[in-house]
Design a protein with these regions (language model features):
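Active-site phosphate-binding and catalytic loops of NTP-dependent enzymes
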Residues: 83-91
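Catalytic NTP-binding/metal-coordinating core of nucleotidyl cyclase/transferase enzymes
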Residues: 1-74, 81
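Short amphipathic alpha-helical interaction patches enriched in hydrophobic/aromatic residues
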Residues: 21-24, 86, 107
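Residues immediately flanking
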Residues: 17, 65, 103-104, 110
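A short glycine-enriched loop-to-beta-strand structural element that forms part of the catalytic core
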Residues: 93-107
């Protein structure tokens, strides 16, 4: 058995709603509607800055980017879009997001015998 190790630099952005559970307790339908609106804004930013979602969990989104610059610019643009959305008089539920960005080396292992 020959195990090969491949490495790849990854830049990950994590977006998470502040106080999501409390919003859901107050008004589940309005919160879900608000989250869907915010998710559209995020997807627009991701497309513009070449990010792609690779995992979601509840109110959290994890996206990978080709560079740290792209991830930071996306995070800033998304926060600006959320601010504009929340300032609208039509907005029932005003959601806030925390954004985290990390860059590091991923290790991939593959068993060469399994690939034949």
């Amino acid at each position: 058995m020959n195990t090969e190790v491949d490495r790849k630099i990854a830049v990950i952005l994590v977006a998470d709603v502040v106080g999501y559970s409390k919003h859901m307790e107050r008004d589940e339908n309005a919160t879900l509607k608000a989250y869907a609106e915010c998710e559209k804004l995020l997807k627009t930013c991701l497309k513009k800055y070449k990010g792609s979602i690779f995992n979601t969990a509840g109110d959290s989104v994890l996206a990978e980017f080709p560079s740290a610059v792209n991830a930071v610019e996306c995070g800033v643009a998304f926060q600006n879009d959320i601010k504009k959305r929340n300032e609208s008089d039509k907005t029932e539920v005003k959601l806030e997001f925390r954004i985290g960005i990390n860059m590091g080396c991923l290790l991939y292992t593959s068993d060469a015998a399994d690939e034949s």
